[in-house]
Design a protein with these regions (language model features):
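A residue-level marker of the well-folded mature domains of exported/periplasmic proteins
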Residues: 27-284
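C-terminal motif of bacterial Sec signal peptides marking the signal peptidase cleavage site
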Residues: 16-20
């Protein structure tokens, strides 16, 4: 089961590289430690232990296939299971649209009751409930993607895992900076696009004021500044990972305030749609 556990982590983490909600806060109770955890004793291809047919993993997901962040996880998980010869029905328990409240704990426990040896959650707000379940079920490996408390918890069966998504946000900022430079050098910006200090205004739609969101928009901002130094950034939070209307309205407000670039760390296309509509209307 060590190989199964590690590869499921790898594919899920690779999937996260392409989406917007994530944490850079992986700690020592992360993929490498999880893969080598002595408590994980089953095997997948010979020797003593259980076979693939006996392996079952639970996936407690904050959204479903209609939401980009969770969809990327689903694609990664199904790819991993296919590579390992696992059946996405027989070897998995799926929990969709699980909010960041006590129902997350209930969903994890139900996965355990159905025979899961490892359970993954995929949202920062799931973390405390995942830790609670790990404390009560030491025989089960529980992975919180994202998160930052596994190391401090001291629990050998509780892990955090995620990609360093802030690196991708820095690259996105570099691309945004190139566009800003093009617009500024070409004289295509109006007075409303500059603040009182002569900085070009940019905006950012964030889900929550969590460390992972702050690190993401900081990386984005630094990426922009690496290309075009004179910028200022306004951040608006929606207090939700997935709120199409809220994200759209936040982006509209930023555009109305003169922001020429809008980044985001949330799960829907709301902000992007607002930018597309503004461009089509010729307002930005």
């Amino acid at each position: 089961m060590k190989r199964l556990f590690a590869l499921l982590l790898v594919f899920a983490m690779v999937a996260c590289l392409f989406v917007g909600c994530g944490s850079n806060g992986s700690d020592d109770n992360s993929i490498s430690n999880a893969a080598n955890d002595n408590n994980v004793t089953a095997k997948d291809d010979g020797g003593s232990g259980t076979s693939n047919a006996d392996f079952k993993a639970g996936f407690v997901l904050v959204g479903d296939e209609n939401e980009g962040y969770t969809y990327a996880h689903i694609v990664g998980i199904e790819k991993a299971m296919g590579e390992l010869g696992l059946d996405k029905s027989a070897n998995a328990v799926w929990k969709y649209s699980v909010p960041e409240d006590e129902s997350c704990y209930d969903a994890i426990v139900d996965c355990i009751d159905q025979g899961c040896q490892v359970v993954f959650t995929n949202s920062y707000g799931h973390q405390s409930f995942a830790q609670q379940a790990a404390e009560e079920h030491p025989e089960v490996q529980i992975v919180s993607m994202t998160g930052d408390t596994a190391k401090r918890s001291g629990l050998p069966n509780f892990h955090n895992a995620f990609t360093k998504i802030f690196e991708a946000r820095y690259v996105a900022g570099v691309v945004a900076g190139m566009k800003i430079k093009e617009l500024a050098d070409g004289g295509k910006l109006s007075d409303s696009n500059y603040d009182a200090d002569g900085n070009v205004k940019i905006g950012y739609v964030g889900a929550y004021p969590y460390a992972e969101v702050v690190s993401g928009y900081t990386a984005f901002f630094q990426g922009v500044k690496s290309v075009y130094e004179k910028v200022s950034m306004e951040v608006q939070y929606t207090n939700s990972w997935f709120d199409i209307t809220g994200e759209n309205e936040a982006a509209v407000a930023l555009i109305a305030d003169g922001c020429v670039i809008v980044g985001q760390h949330a799960d829907s296309t709301g902000a992007a749609s607002a930018c597309e509509a503004a461009l089509s209307a010729g307002t930005t």
